[in-house]
Amino acid sequence: MMTPRSNFSLRHETRSMRSKRTRFIILVSTFLIVLATTIFLISQSRTTFTPEEIIEPQNRVPVDMSKKGDREAENQGKVVYLTFDDGPSKLTAKLLDLLKEHDIKATFFMQGSQLQRTQLQNDVRRAVQEGHYVGAHSMTHQYKKLYQEKQFVPEMHETLSLIHDITGEKPHLVRPPYGSVPGLASKQIRDQIAEAGIKLWDWTIDSNDWRLKDQPNEIVENIKRGTKSNLEVVLMHEKPQTLEALPDIINFYKQEGYKFAVYDESEHVQMNFLKDDRL
């Protein structure tokens, strides 16, 4: 039989255990709140991005067409520019064959490290001879070097010079690897680009073809879903799945009443996420 003192001790111990448990719960909760707050503040203050984060089209700033671009769309109706990055490659000739078959001119943004491969240079010359535009896509395609180490203009100059040496043309249009945002957000580097007479082109539709190996149908669907305006610039790459998808992409735009256009330096269309009308 428990005495009153025993009852008191039991109640005291129970209250003590509850009090300790409550303090423990409060301590853990406070720690978790502080941890979550710290992680949030760090994530909000981050100023660098990985290429994987940068290339997501959902995070893109909508392109604000220049008045010249609006006039072109009004004068010509629906216009689409097919663009191909990362060449020249072993697929360049096949892309040119397919484009020739459909009587379509395209815009290529070629990489310096590939342009230096002499066995691919005939395809670069052929592209220009057949009426396509060849612009620059940097020498290295390295985000850190181009944007953080401020080598964008020197690399583009070197790549444009290579194109001139191979083709005799003097292009001024470049496509920033991973797009112009956020790498070219600094006005200082944009001033350098403008002073160098370089023009930038981003895109209105990212096909995401580079990540869709063996999925040409998904590439086509991405482009269909992204097509919303009378003036579209489609980002693609020299990939096997892109080559396979291209006939369906061409047929889609023909059915939708689009005309295929190639970049013309005398009629520059502003097409950069930065909305910088100098570029």
What are these regions (language model features)?
Residues H141-E265, F273-R278:
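Catalytic domains of cell-wall/extracellular-matrix polysaccharide-remodeling enzymes
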Residues M1-T22:
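N-terminal Lys/Arg-rich, disordered targeting/topogenic segments
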Residues I25-L41:
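Hydrophobic membrane-insertion alpha-helices, especially the h-region
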